[in-house]
């Protein structure tokens, strides 16, 4: 399962970020709570911004990289939970996303960063910037954990 985490991270992260929009199309249990058009536009703009690497030239700083990556994953889990409670995400979508995101937390460690090479190191270097989101870095530097 860990080998698939980063390959699935972009779709899972986007699911958590776009749950209010996506839930309207996949909600099975009950009708979704509709979002006003301007809110849907804001969600799409935020998701697009979070999917883009903002700063590529940061030096590798493992403590900062792990802190940023873990914070990003934890935030996605919290947003998913809030969207589930608020009726914007189905239980099935939440159940599909959370195990992989929770497993990812176990992979993101300072020791892993310090031993990283290649694309894995590039991911941690990307996460060394406070301006980058874990979704963007995972998308730009996908690796097998």
Would you name each region that the model predicts?
Residues 2-12:
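Bacterial N-terminal signal peptides that target proteins for export
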Residues 6, 16, 27-28:
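Generic N-terminal simple sequence motifs
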Residues 10-20:
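Bacterial N-terminal signal peptides
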Residues 22-26:
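Boundary at the C-terminal end of the N-terminal hydrophobic targeting segment
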Residues 27-44:
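Short N-terminal segments immediately surrounding and downstream of signal-peptide cleavage
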Residues 41-106:
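Short N-proximal segments of mature Sec-exported proteins
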Residues 88-145:
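Compact alpha-helical subdomains of small soluble proteins
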């Amino acid at each position: 399962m860990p080998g698939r985490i980063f390959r699935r991270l972009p779709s899972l992260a986007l699911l958590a970020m776009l749950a209010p929009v996506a839930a309207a199309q996949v909600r099975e249990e009950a009708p979704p709570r509709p979002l006003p058009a301007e809110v849907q536009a804001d969600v799409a703009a935020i998701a697009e911004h979070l999917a883009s690497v903002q700063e590529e030239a940061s030096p590798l700083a493992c403590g900062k990289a792990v802190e940023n990556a873990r914070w990003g994953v934890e935030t996605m889990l919290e947003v998913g939970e809030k969207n589930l409670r608020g009726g914007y995400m189905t239980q099935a979508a939440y159940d599909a996303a959370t195990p992989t995101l929770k497993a990812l937390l176990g992979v993101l460690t300072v020791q892993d960063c310090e031993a990283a090479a290649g694309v894995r190191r590039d991911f941690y270097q990307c996460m060394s910037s406070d301006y980058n989101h874990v979704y963007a870095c995972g998308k730009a530097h996908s690796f097998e954990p």
